């Protein structure tokens, strides 16, 4: 989050940026094995197509806020949440702000849904007092339910 940064683009551009970070004293650089230029303008056409696909869904007030990973803004209607979801495809994300907003919401626990556990690890650094896990930490849905029922410890 605050100490982590992801840079995306063509390999030649990444090499130039990596050299600049090393010269500036970066302590660690990791090349992610990702083939899709997610969260970059290179996917702007995909974002537009996705937004069009989502536009058929009904408008309604949400029963819980949905945070935009772009700027940690809380969407409270379906249309604003779906708009943010589509924009996230081609816009850089600000996980640090998003995780800070989650912390400020004072949840009883946080469960990262999706592949991996990178965000759960980042959140545990930011808010060690809040129990956090990722779905990938569990072998089954029943394990997740047991964790939640046990008070998240």
Language model features: what each stretch is:
Residues 1-153:
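Acyl-group transfer acyltransferase/transacylase scaffold of fatty acid/polyketide systems
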